[in-house]
Each structure stands twice: as structure tokens, then as C-alpha cells.
Amino acid sequence: YEALCKRSDIDLVYIAADWNHHFPVAKFAMENGKHTAIEVPSAMNLDQCWSLINLSEQTRKHCFILENCCYDYYEMNALAMAQDGVFGDIIRAEGAYIHCLEDFWDAYWKDPADNDKDNLHWRMKYNMENRGDVYPTHGLGPVAQCLNIHRGDRFTTLVAMDTESFVGKDWVKNKSGKECKEFRNGDHTTTLMRTAKGKVVEIQHNVMTPQP
């Protein structure tokens, strides 16, 4: 990607790699004078977030988060209705990323011979090592637009709770033949947020259990 970012005939770099490469590719692209459009998540921690913000301001290059769920037909239609006052004053909203990845976990298991986390595919590894809603913007993005977040309102309070990892641990055990003692991401995570104007948002994350 470095050779591509250095080319003089390219204005924008569209980044749709694995999560771990979103930040370094975006950083290198802006350092070489390119606008960036990044699939979510655009960064993996707060330091990376601020680095992208500061670099975008310093280089005067756009750094755009491509949260596709903000721009599908259904979401754009709902946003237009909200802005036209069809729903009145929205005081509570829900969003979620509920996507059972049971059919995909085999592809996310890099080394089926053992349970060495260093040999895992990046997505399985991230779910095993990190707790909380690790993919919030599919649900939060459209909701934030409808509630005018950072356009007159802002989130002030957040609390999150998760279930134990039941399916995750069982899946690793069945795949590796060994007990899985550490799987930090719960099967289901629920997050409640309150805004400065008293609105409430509920966000859910679940990639482990089937839903009706």
C-alpha cells in the first residue's frame, strides 16, 4: 500500500482491509498527500483516533469514516423522515449489530491445530481479547444522525453490560479440543447512552447467537 499511496495520479485512498490495517494505511496515505475513506472501525484505540484527527488537520486532507449503514436506502429514508418531523421529537432510539457469524468463524480460525491466540485470524483474536461493543457504528451511526449528535446534542453518559461468553468459549473448545478460559467478548453486549438534551439510545452487539 505504501507504493500506491506515493503515486501522484491518486487523490483518495479507499481502505477496506482488516481492522488492524485501517489506521496505518490511513496515516501513511495522509502523510503522502492523499484523502482517505476508511471502512469501520477507522482506528483501534483513542490514541489512533486523535492521531487521525490531528493528521487530517495538519495535512488538510479529508479523513472520512465509511459507515455504510448510514447511507443505505432504509437509513437515508428514515433520516429524511426524522428531519421532516414525521416522528415528532425523538426521545429514545435503538440500534444494533446483531449478526451471527457462525458460518464465518471457520474462516476466522487461522490455525485449527491449537489454541494459540497468536495464530488466530484477526477477527477471532480481537473478539477473544477485547470486551464490550467492538463494532458499534452500524447501529449507532444512523441513530446519531437522527438525533443530531454533534449538531446540537451530544452524548454525556454511557453504561454497558454484557453476558458471559458462553458460545464463544464453547466454539473455541470445539475447534481446538482445549478448554477456553479467556474469551473477553461476551455473547451479547447492551449499551445505554444519554445525551445532553435528555435523549436515550440503546445499542446492542451480538455476533455469537442466532436471532429470530
Question: What are the roles of these predicted feature ranges?
Answer:
Residues Y1-D11:
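A structured beta-alpha segment of the ubiquitous adenosine-cofactor-binding alpha/beta core
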Residues L12, D18-W19, F23-Y71, G85:
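Beta-strand-loop-alpha-helix segment that lines the small-molecule cofactor/substrate pocket
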Residues C180-T189, M193-P212:
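NAD(P)-dinucleotide binding in Rossmann-like oxidoreductases
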Residues T59-H62, C69-F183:
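Predominantly a Rossmann-like dinucleotide-binding segment in NAD(P)-dependent oxidoreductases
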Residues D11-L12, R92:
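Short, Asp-centered acidic motifs that coordinate Mg2+ and/or phosphate
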Residues I10, W19, H99, E164, ...:
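Flexible, active-site-proximal loop/turn residues at the rims of small-molecule/cofactor binding pockets
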